[in-house]
């Protein structure tokens, strides 16, 4: 008798995988185990909850029980997996165990909180659960410090500013989105945030946080300090690899998988934010959707290597939206930038004259798909 497929996790990657499996096989036993409620919500919506006055419960799209009934699943919510015995094909919690034929790790990633004094005063917004824990504080806060000027930090800064809050955005780098693109490209967004009233503290590092009568005092390494009501860590995500380590599979930054989404153990796979696919961590929706399509085939006996085309990454900053694609982080590209009132096109060219990356904004985003077709990958 088939012991079926177990998926650990309940986020976007797990749900996409379930849907793709059920398109091909209505009956293979499917079990999902996760530490949260397993209710469905759209994680990117977390970047806009404050300006849209949404409570955590407003984000729920489908209850766990409805999902289980729709796709013929066994669900175990609020369940922490303690260990995996890869040789015996057994998943263990504190008081239960499950046998599997194939196991999929879809454990996601956790928000990194800088290891400074007072780090317990920092909030994170990496899940509906995390937002639920701090929504009252964030709604009531008037002065907000966001630590980290990457994708999420920039999105949150704009959202909190649109909600009428006093926002300070801090980053170690000299420009926003520094790990994604050069300053001459990100400067359009940077200037717009400044014009909106966001106070930028670039080339700045947080040293400590202290509770005061007036709120929270944030002290920088420079000894400059500011008083705020809430501090949000937007300093990146760390793939969740602890379970994979316990199972004895190879991990690096993420859970290492090949083009078949297979780990170093032949019956254990990984997908989504926790996975490192041939050396790349790709925590974006489109590669996860494609990964789910291919992994579903492979779990059901197929042998389909994942092929990822050039894909768009969308920066959800509504007043100055950006799309980017290609190797925008490369330092050896020559950038050709056309900036006009209706938007910007920035093309990153290699020494051989090939288009290796691009960033488009506002009304020029409609040109993104044509540029994708000419992108060298």
Swiss-Prot record:
It comes from the Bacteria. This is Nitric oxide reductase FlRd-NAD(+) reductase. GO terms for cellular component: cytoplasm. GO terms for molecular function: oxidoreductase activity, acting on iron-sulfur proteins as donors, NAD or NADP as acceptor. Keywords: Cytoplasm, FAD, Flavoprotein, NAD, Oxidoreductase. It comes from Salmonella dublin (strain CT_02021853). Its cofactor is FAD. Belongs to the FAD-dependent oxidoreductase family. The lineage of its organism: Bacteria, Pseudomonadati, Pseudomonadota, Gammaproteobacteria, Enterobacterales. It catalyses: 2 reduced [nitric oxide reductase rubredoxin domain] + NAD(+) + H(+) = 2 oxidized [nitric oxide reductase rubredoxin domain] + NADH. Pathway: Nitrogen metabolism; nitric oxide reduction. It is found in: Cytoplasm. Its EC number is 1.18.1.-. One of at least two accessory proteins for anaerobic nitric oxide (NO) reductase. Reduces the rubredoxin moiety of NO reductase. Coiled coil: none annotated. InterPro entries: FAD-bd_OxRdtase, FAD/NAD-bd_sf, FAD/NAD-binding_dom, NO_rdtase_NorW, Rbx-bd. Pfam families: Pyr_redox_2, Rbx_binding.
